[in-house]
């Protein structure tokens, strides 16, 4: 027979593992959301490769301490859910923030991104950062522009010399 304490130990180990593996973990207060709204948020998270989980605060506090993320412990008050992102550190904050704009009952409480705790305005600002793919595309675009301009310049010089040679 499995004891309740063993189940709780497994849950703490699971949460600890998720906190350690995640690029970001965003704590949200879902109080006041209807079941359909929570289901929609879960769906949006799944579509982006995120994980939306509700755990008991006591177990989450123990897991945060085990994972060396003590700064998160103070934020675990009231009904909380955690949105985990394992690849893109911005994705969880972005999905939660976008959902909160249309659903006023969802509150972003705190976010742990690569070991740094963000709150309130900092978290909103962090959520506004473009995704990794967009940033890479912008960087590559900025590299491409000077090279393209240089190629056009060389072509113009070659065309001019060719025109002078024919005249």
Swiss-Prot record:
One of its GO terms (cellular component) is ribosome. InterPro entries: Ribosomal_uL10 (IPR001790), Ribosomal_uL10-like_sf (IPR043141), Ribosomal_uL10_bac (IPR022973), Ribosomal_uL10_bac_type (IPR047865). SUPFAM superfamilies: Ribosomal protein L10-like. One of its GO terms (molecular function) is large ribosomal subunit rRNA binding. Keywords: Ribonucleoprotein, Ribosomal protein, RNA-binding, rRNA-binding. HAMAP family: Ribosomal_uL10 (MF_00362). Belongs to the universal ribosomal protein uL10 family. This is Large ribosomal subunit protein uL10. NCBIfam families: PRK00099.1-1. Pfam families: Ribosomal_L10 (PF00466). Forms part of the ribosomal stalk, playing a central role in the interaction of the ribosome with GTP-bound translation factors. GO terms for biological process: translation. Part of the ribosomal stalk of the 50S ribosomal subunit. The N-terminus interacts with L11 and the large rRNA to form the base of the stalk. The C-terminus forms an elongated spine to which L12 dimers bind in a sequential fashion forming a multimeric L10(L12)X complex. The keyword rRNA-binding applies. The lineage of its organism: Bacteria, Bacillati, Bacillota, Clostridia, Peptostreptococcales. Signal peptide: none annotated.
């Amino acid at each position: 027979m499995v004891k309740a304490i063993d189940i709780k130990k497994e849950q703490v180990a699971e949460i600890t593992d998720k906190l350690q593996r995640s690029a970001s973990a965003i704590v949200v207060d879902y109080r006041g959301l209807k079941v359909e709204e929570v289901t929609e948020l879960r769906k949006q998270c799944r579509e982006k490769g995120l994980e939306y989980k509700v755990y008991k605060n006591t177990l989450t506090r123990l897991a945060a301490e085990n994972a060396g993320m003590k700064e998160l412990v103070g934020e675990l008050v009231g009904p909380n859910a955690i949105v985990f992102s394992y690849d893109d550190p911005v994705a969880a904050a972005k999905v939660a923030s976008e959902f909160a704009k249309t659903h006023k009952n969802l509150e972003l409480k705190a976010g742990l991104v690569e070991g740094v705790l963000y709150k309130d305005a900092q978290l909103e600002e962090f959520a506004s950062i473009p995704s990794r793919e967009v940033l890479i595309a912008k960087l590559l675009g900025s590299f491409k522009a000077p090279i393209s301009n240089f190629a056009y310049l060389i072509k113009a010089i070659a065309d001019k010399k060719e025109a002078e040679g024919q005249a």
